[in-house]
Each structure stands twice: as structure tokens, then as C-alpha cells.
Amino acid sequence: MKDEEFWVRRSATEALEKCSSPKILPRLCEFLLTTVDSSLLRWVLNTIAAIQERCKFYNYTLTEAILVPETQLKIPPIQLIFTSLMHILHLSDLHFGTLDQANLWSNQLAADLYNDINISHLDALILSGDIANYSTDDEYKAAAQFLDNLRQDLPLNPEQIILVPGNHDLNWKLAKKAYKPVYREDYDGQLIDGHYIEESASVIGVRDETEYKQRFAHFSSFYKTIKQNPYPLEYDQQYTLDHLPEQNLLILGLNSAWELDHHYKTRASINTNALSNALTQIRRNLDYKNCLKIAVWHHPLDSAYSDRITDQGFLEQLAVNGFRLFLHGHIHKAETSLFRYDMSSDGRKLDRICAGTFGAPVREWVPGYPLQYNLLKFEDNQLTVYTRRREELNGAWKPDARWLQGAGKTPLDYYAIAL
């Protein structure tokens, strides 16, 4: 790696990435303290990350067994590529309506995290859709107030807050306005299936495509309030990438409600162009290569109802591009399952983590399922998903022991996933 030729140095780091022993790590870390080549520094960091991933050896301390010359004492400490402990809060189907809800719910949640779970720091907060109820500005003001309250107890930067839209995050009134009534016999254009509505035997509602995209405008403005940039209204740009380098984490957000409106309520899907654009961006950024990759959207793959994602081929793309987990909501009950792309024990796979509803009106609760949320705890090579429940509107959160362990055994309020 000290060769004068660029291609030789690059080839050396690529070869070391295939190393199956962690014994080389001390020498690589020592090399980091001596190199001044910024490109080589990044390659070596990627090499270390690849070795750690292959060897499942994430807790190596870069300062151990390294003798630092006195002349280099001013070199800033190197960030660990993997963290040994990480907490992600997963909320879904919040259905905000009022500022009173924002104040009550944030207080109930912070009290639970602080007092019962003993959490005073979050690495990320994921809201997997249906943040509002009717996608109005007032509802998003309540959601923003909730987040502002929560961040005063648990500080979070904008990049640590992941937001994706659900079917309640598009405004039906704006969707209706985009359909223009026309007498069928007077319409000369091409009628594309799914782009118009049969209003009567003689009248159709033809969609104004530009105006139709505005049904996500209120969500987009809310997104800008929290994330500092508006949510894209063009469908092929409706993906988000939140990279948290300190946690070695990459979270992809997708819009599974991009084809939905007041009339077409069940066309949940993932836009193939948005997914392709996202995966291309991920592949071309070396900083993302060895990250733990999580995908988030709103709708389920399996459901008793028709409002589910039926075209599930995109899961294969996520699997071969290194994604390990996907999170969603919508069904108002916590669930988990596994998508296996390879059948080998160490093959490519994605664990599914579904959160229940955090704030839906009582009339929309699933029988037997109260309000719920998930707390994801990453430690070493294991993810533990803790499920919390709240039955009383003005009550407190508590453990949700619904994960069965076998006949005659006590159910647990958590389940574990080996990473």
C-alpha cells in the first residue's frame, strides 16, 4: 500500500478486503495513523469495515496495541466504523390531529424511554408513514411539535430523523381537484387505465398529472420543516437516503403510496424508477459500501385486505444490494417475518419489522392490539426488537409481551434477530 503507483495501492486494499482473519486489523489501524493520502485513507477504512463484516469482529478498539509517535499526538481520534450499541425508535401510523396530542404523546413516550427502558439517547428515529390523518397543515404542525418536544428530551439531528409517507399523508381534497370532469364524448385524448375516473355513464374525471402530484404538498412542507429540504413530488425522486457514518448505518426511505388517492385506495407499490435511482446512488458511493442497510416504507407485503404491495420483486433487488432489514406499518399491529433470497444459512435475507399504530383513533384499532411502538437495540451481531403497548388514551406505555416462546412458556416483550 506504500507503492508509488496509484493502481497498485488500490489493488492492495481491494485484495485485503477479502481477508478472512481479523489479525491484520492492528497493522491496518497503525497504517491509518501514518498515511497522509486521503484517498488511501478511505480505501483502508473500507477495507477494515469489510474485514470486520466478514469476520463478525466489530468491537476492535483502534487505540489498542498501537504505539503512537510523540510527533503524531495531535492527530484527531479515528471514528470507529461499527458501534457496539445503537438504539433506533420506530413509530408508525401516528395519525396526528391536534397540538394537545403532540404534547401528551411526546410526554408519555419520553417518560417511557427515560423511566422504564432507561434510554437517554437515540441514534435514529424512524416514522414509517401515516404521520397525519388527513394530510393537512394543522396536523403536520402537531407532528412537528411532537418531534420538537421529543428532541428536547432525546436530542436528534435532522439526518437522524427518517420520514416516509403513508396513505394518510396524501391530501384527498387536492387529489380530487386534480381530476377534471369531461364529457366522455368530448374527450379527444388517450384514456390511460388508472389515470381517470368513471364519474357516470357520460362523464369522466381526467387527471391533470402536474396538479395530481400536489396531493403530497403538505407532507413535503412538513418534511422540509424537519429535514430542511422538501420531499420530492416527482415519483422517480421519491426516495431518501439518510447516512449515519458514526453508526455505520444507511436508511433508504421509499413511498409506497405514490399511486394512491381518494378513489384508488389499494394501489400500494414501490416505484421502480425511484428504487433504481436509489440503488444506483448507493452503489456508486463507497461510503455506503459496508453500512448496515435498512429500507423503510409504509405498506405491508401481506395483509388480510387488498391495500398491500402485491408486486414484491423489489425485495430481491434490496437483498442483492446488501439490505438486511425492512420496516413498515399500516396494519396497526406489530409483526415480524423473514424474506429469504438465498436458502443457505448465511445467505442474503431481509428481516421484516412491522410496528403497530402509535396514535390511531380507537375506532381504527385492530381487535386485541392496543397502541404500540418498537425500540430497536443493536448490540454486537444481534438486533433485539422491544415492543411497547398502551391501552389507555391518557395512560402510560408498558411492555407488550406478545412474542410466544413455546407451549407452557411465558411470552416475551421482545424478539431477537441475528445479524
Question: Where are the regions a protein language model picked out?
Answer:
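A short C-terminal boundary segment appended to hydrolase-like catalytic domains
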Residues: K377-L419
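Amphipathic alpha-helical scaffolding segments comprising HEAT/armadillo-like alpha-solenoid repeats
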Residues: M1-K2, S21-L33, K56-E64
